[in-house]
C-alpha cells in the first residue's frame, strides 16, 4: 500500500490583519480568543509584501472582512491602535502537519484499530520504534512504519516489527526493519543511568523503568545484591549507583558484554561482578565455600601442608574440567596479598572459584582459554576503592557465601522454576545475618490465582513461604499480568541440613 501525501492537504480560507510589527503584541492581546488556534501554527506571521509589517491570522470563526464577528469594543480598541487593514489569507495544512494518529485513521479501513503509542508502539528507545504488528494490521505494516518514521524523525531513525514469538534461549525477539537505517545499537536513559545496547541481540523493555526503580529503592548502600537474570543491567546499574555490591549474571554473552560497557559508562564498574553462565550454576557457585575458607571439623585434624596441596590440586583439576571459569579484567592491587600464604608452597586452591569469591589478583588474565561459562570482574582499578560505596567492608572482603541481602530473578516466563536452586544452597555455619529477600518475577493469567503462584513457588523451593508479597507490575495482555513475588528465604529451604530433612520428610509422606 502506497502513501499519497497530497490526499492529506487541507486548504483553509482565512482573514488576517496587516499591522506594523511593533504593534503585534498589543493587537494580539486585544484579539485574544479570536486568533487562529491550531497546534504548531503561529497566528502571527510575516507579511510577504512588507518587511516592517506582520499578518495576524484570525480564527476560522471570523467569516466577514468587516470583522463584524468580533465584539464592537474590541474593534474600537483596534481602530485606536492603528489603521486596520483586513486581507485574505490562505493556509494549507499538509501531510507534515497531521499527527501519526490522524494519518493512520485516514488510511486504515473502518473497524481496524489504530495502533497507539501505549499498546503497540514503543518510542522510549533512543532512535528505534518497536512495532508489534499482527493480524489484520499486517498488510499495512509498511505504511504504518513510514508514518511513524515520518512523524518522529530525527528522534526515530529505525522502525522495526517483531516477527513471530520468542523461541530462543536468550528471550530476544526477532525483528524485521521496515524503514530507516539498519542500526539496532542505541542508548537508553533511565533516571540517572545510561544503557547502551544492541536491540537485536539483547532483551530490553523500557516500560519496566518504574519497576526497576521501585525495587532498587528497597536496597541500602553497602548491601549485597545478586541478579540472576541481569540482562544489560537495568537493576544492577542503579543498584550499584546506590552503593550496593552487585553480582550480576546472564546466560546471554551479549547481555554481559553490554552490562560491562554500561558499568563503565555509569562509573560503577568497581561495584559489579559480571557472570555469563546458567542461573542455577551461577547461584550454586556463588554460594559455594572455597576450599581455603572451609572450617575444619572439631574432631578432624588440620591437614598438613602437603595434604592440603594435594587436595587443592585435585579441586583445580576438577574446575578445569567444567567448573566455574574466570575472566578477570584487573583487580584492586591490595587483593593479591590475601593469597600470599597459600601461593608460597602450592598451587592456589580452587583457583577458578576462589578468585571470584575473593576477587584476588591471582585470577587469570583476560583473553585466556575458557571451556565453560565466564565471570568478569568489571574494571577493578589499582589503588582505587569506589567512592560511592558506603558499606563498611571493602569489595575485596565480601564473601557471598556468608551473606547476600537481595536476590533478583527477572525472568517472568520461568523464574519460579529456578527457585529449586535455593534448596540446601547455604551452609548454616558460614552464614551471617538474616537470610536474603527473593524477588521473583512471574506472569499470572486471568484463570490463575495468587495462591496458585505462591504454591508453585513453594513446590519449587520444597518449603513454605512466610508472608509473601505480590506486587502487580503491569498488564502485558488483556488476560495476563506481570507480578513480582517477594519473600524472605526460609531456613527450611536454603540451609543444607534443614533442606535435606525437609526433602526426607516430604519423601516419607508419599
From Swiss-Prot:
- Cross-referenced SUPFAM superfamilies: S-adenosyl-L-methionine-dependent methyltransferases (SSF53335)
Principal location listed in the UniProt entry:
mitochondrion
Residues that span the membrane, as ranges = none
Q: Does the keyword Lipid biosynthesis apply?
A: no
UniProt keywords (A-Z) are:
Cytoplasm, Methyltransferase, Mitochondrion, Nucleus, S-adenosyl-L-methionine, Transferase, tRNA processing
Q: What is its EC number?
A: 2.1.1.228
Q: Which GO terms describe its molecular function?
A: tRNA (guanine(37)-N1)-methyltransferase activity; tRNA methyltransferase activity
What does the UniProt entry say about where the protein is found? Mitochondrion matrix; Nucleus; Cytoplasm
Reaction(s) catalysed by this chain, per the record, are: guanosine(37) in tRNA + S-adenosyl-L-methionine = N(1)-methylguanosine(37) in tRNA + S-adenosyl-L-homocysteine + H(+)
Q: Which positions does UniProt annotate for S-adenosyl-L-methionine binding?
A: 212, 250-251, 278-279, 410
- What GO biological process term is on the record, naming one? tRNA N1-guanine methylation
| GO CC terms of this entry | cytoplasm; mitochondrial matrix; nucleus
Kindly report, in one word, the top-level EC class recorded for this enzyme: transferase
Q: Which Pfam families match?
A: TRM5-TYW2_MTfase (PF02475), TYW2_N_2 (PF25133)
Assembly mode: Monomer.
Function, please? Specifically methylates the N1 position of guanosine-37 in various cytoplasmic and mitochondrial tRNAs. Methylation is not dependent on the nature of the nucleoside 5' of the target nucleoside. This is the first step in the biosynthesis of wybutosine (yW), a modified base adjacent to the anticodon of tRNAs and required for accurate decoding.
Family of this protein: Belongs to the class I-like SAM-binding methyltransferase superfamily. TRM5/TYW2 family.
Protein's UniProt name: tRNA (guanine(37)-N(1))-methyltransferase 2
Amino acid at each position: 500500500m502506497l502513501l499519497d501525501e497530497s490526499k492529506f492537504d487541507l486548504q483553509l480560507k482565512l482573514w488576517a490583519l496587516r499591522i506594523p510589527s511593533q504593534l503585534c503584541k498589543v493587537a494580539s492581546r486585544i484579539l485574544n480568543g479570536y486568533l487562529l488556534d491550531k497546534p504548531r501554527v503561529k497566528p502571527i506571521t510575516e507579511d510577504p509584501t512588507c518587511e516592517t509589517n506582520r499578518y495576524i491570522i484570525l480564527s476560522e470563526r471570523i467569516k466577514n472582512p468587516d470583522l463584524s464577528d468580533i465584539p464592537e469594543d474590541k474593534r474600537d480598541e483596534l481602530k485606536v491602535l492603528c489603521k486596520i487593514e483586513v486581507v485574505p489569507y490562505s493556509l494549507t495544512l499538509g501531510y507534515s502537519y497531521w499527527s501519526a494518529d490522524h494519518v493512520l485513521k485516514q488510511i486504515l479501513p473502518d473497524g481496524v484499530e489504530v495502533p497507539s503509542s501505549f499498546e503497540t508502539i514503543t518510542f522510549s528507545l533512543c532512535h528505534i520504534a518497536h512495532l508489534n504488528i499482527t493480524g489484520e494490521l499486517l498488510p499495512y505494516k509498511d505504511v504504518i512504519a513510514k508514518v511513524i518514521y515520518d512523524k518522529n524523525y530525527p528522534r526515530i531513525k529505525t522502525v522495526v516489527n517483531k516477527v513471530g514469538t520468542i523461541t530462543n534461549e536468550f528471550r530476544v525477539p526477532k525483528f524485521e526493519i521496515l524503514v530507516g537505517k539498519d542500526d539496532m545499537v542505541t542508548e537508553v536513559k533511565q533516571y540517572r543511568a545510561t544503557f547502551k545496547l544492541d536491540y537485536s541481540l539483547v532483551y530490553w523493555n523500557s516500560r519496566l523503568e518504574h519497576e526497576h526503580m521501585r525495587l532498587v529503592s528497597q536496597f541500602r548502600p553497602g548491601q549485597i545484591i545478586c541478579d540472576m537474570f541481569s540482562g544489560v543491567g537495568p537493576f544492577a546499574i542503579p543498584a550499584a549507583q546506590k552503593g550496593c555490591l552487585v553480582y550480576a549474571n546472564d546466560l546471554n554473552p551479549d547481555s554481559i558484554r553490554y552490562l560491562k560497557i554500561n558499568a563503565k559508562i555509569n562509573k560503577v564498574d568497581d561495584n559489579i561482578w559480571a557472570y555469563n553462565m546458567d542461573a542455577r550454576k551461577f547461584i550454586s557457585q556463588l554460594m559455594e565455600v572455597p576450599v581455603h575458607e572451609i572450617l575444619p571439623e572439631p574432631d578432624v585434624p588440620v591437614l598438613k601442608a602437603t595434604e592440603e596441596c594435594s587436595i587443592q590440586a585435585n579441586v583445580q583439576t576438577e574446575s578445569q574440567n567444567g567448573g566455574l571459569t574466570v575472566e578477570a579484567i584487573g583487580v584492586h592491587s591490595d587483593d593479591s596479598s590475601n593469597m600470599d600464604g597459600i601461593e608460597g608452597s602450592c598451587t592456589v586452591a580452587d583457583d577458578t572459584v576462589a578468585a571470584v569469591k575473593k576477587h584476588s589478583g591471582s585470577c587469570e588474565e583476560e583473553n585466556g582459554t575458557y571451556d565453560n561459562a565466564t565471570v568478569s570482574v568489571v574494571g577493578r582499578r589499582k589503588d582505587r576503592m569506589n567512592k560511592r560505596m558506603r558499606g563498611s567492608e571493602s569489595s575485596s572482603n565480601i564473601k557471598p557465601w556468608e551473606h547476600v541481602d537481595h536476590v533478583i530473578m527477572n525472568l517472568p516466563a520461568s523464574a519460579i522454576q529456578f527457585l529449586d536452586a535455593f534448596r540446601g544452597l547455604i551452609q548454616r555455619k558460614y552464614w551471617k545475618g538474616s537470610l536474603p529477600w527473593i524477588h521473583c518475577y512471574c506472569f499470572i493469567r486471568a484463570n490463575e490465582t495468587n495462591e496458585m503462584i505462591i504454591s508453585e513457588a513453594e513446590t519449587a523451593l520444597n518449603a513454605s513461604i512466610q508472608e509473601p508479597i505480590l506486587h502487580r507490575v503491569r498488564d502485558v495482555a488483556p488476560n495476563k499480568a506481570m507480578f513480582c513475588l517477594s519473600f524472605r528465604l526460609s531456613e527450611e529451604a536454603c540451609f543444607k541440613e534443614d533442606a535435606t530433612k525437609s526433602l526426607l520428610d516430604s519423601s516419607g509422606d508419599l
